[in-house]
Structure formats: C-alpha cells, structure tokens
Amino acid sequence: GMGRLKMSERPKTLTEKQAVAAVGQVALTHLYQNLFSEYNKIIAQFLLTKADFSDRNRYLNARNVSLNLLKKGIIPVVNENDAVVADEIKVGDNDTLSALVAGLIDADLLIILSDIEGLYNKNPQKYDDAKLIKLVGKIDEDIKKMAGMEGSKFGTGGMYTKIIAAEMATKIGTNLVIASGGEPENIGKII
C-alpha cells in the first residue's frame, strides 16, 4: 500500500497501518490475478485472521471454503487480513500463516521461499564458510539458534520464523522445504 500511496515512511498508528494494508491488499491481489491469468488459472482472495484458526466454527468454515476452491481448481491466495487485525491478535508473519494453512487443508508439502537457499549453520551474509543444512531431522534449540535466534527468547522474522513454521508443519505431518525464491525452477525440482 505504501508504494501505491507514494509514502516514503511507514505509518505509525494502527489505523494508518490498517488503511495502508487495505490499499496494498487490492494491489497485491490484482498482481496475482494478472500473473495467474497468463496460465489460465483463476485465483480467489482469501483473507484470514488468528480467530479463523482459534474458533472451531470459523476454522471449519475456512477449511471448507479452502477445500472447495481447490476442488474447483481455483488457487486461494491467502494473506492475513491486516486491515482488521491489531498487533496483539495477529498471526504475525507469513511463514506461520503458511504452516497454519497447510494444516487447514491437510497439505502434504509446504514450500517456503526465501531470499537464501535455506538454513545455514551460520549466517551466510556474515560468514564465507557458512554451510547449507540440506536436511533437518529434528528441530531443536540448536537448529533454532542456527536460524538466527542467537540465544534470545524471541525471533523477529527471517529464517527463525521459517524454522518455527517448519516445526509447526512437521508436527501435523506436512513436509516442509525452504528454498530460494530467486530461482523459479526450484519449485519444479522440489515437486
């Protein structure tokens, strides 16, 4: 929304953030609609909130709608409904949201795209000798530290949120792959 509104600074108040998010959501959906139409695919905008995962009736409704869309060959473009949620009731990040949606639809596989190839044993932007961890058997505190937790109690995004999403997804039986989004052929290789 900031780009569409030609804003140079992030909004400060919750109401301003929500208004900008509402503008941005339309632009984002339009972009996805144009991209998927090149492949003769129909999309549906599907905005969710934390309440959709914590209230049983809302959860079942979201599940039924999602599965119905998929059955019809329609691609649900899922995002958090930032125009109506406050910070304290947010899912929080798209990695977590993707793991929740994977559970919602009983997905076999969740692919999370990143700006790097995956989890490294240390930050590859700081250390030349960083090595890609190709397979993680179990997510423990050491893995979380590798992901950027750095001994703190809270992650702020990046690889840490992807590892937390991986932990959530694998607990419900969904396989998860973290791959570079800069290489479109990765998705085909993974599938």
Please provide the spans of the model-predicted regions.
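Nucleotide/pyrophosphate-binding catalytic subdomain
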Residues: G1-K171, N175, G181-E183
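Active-site loop ensemble at the mouth of alpha/beta enzyme cores that anchors a bound cofactor
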Residues: E185-I191
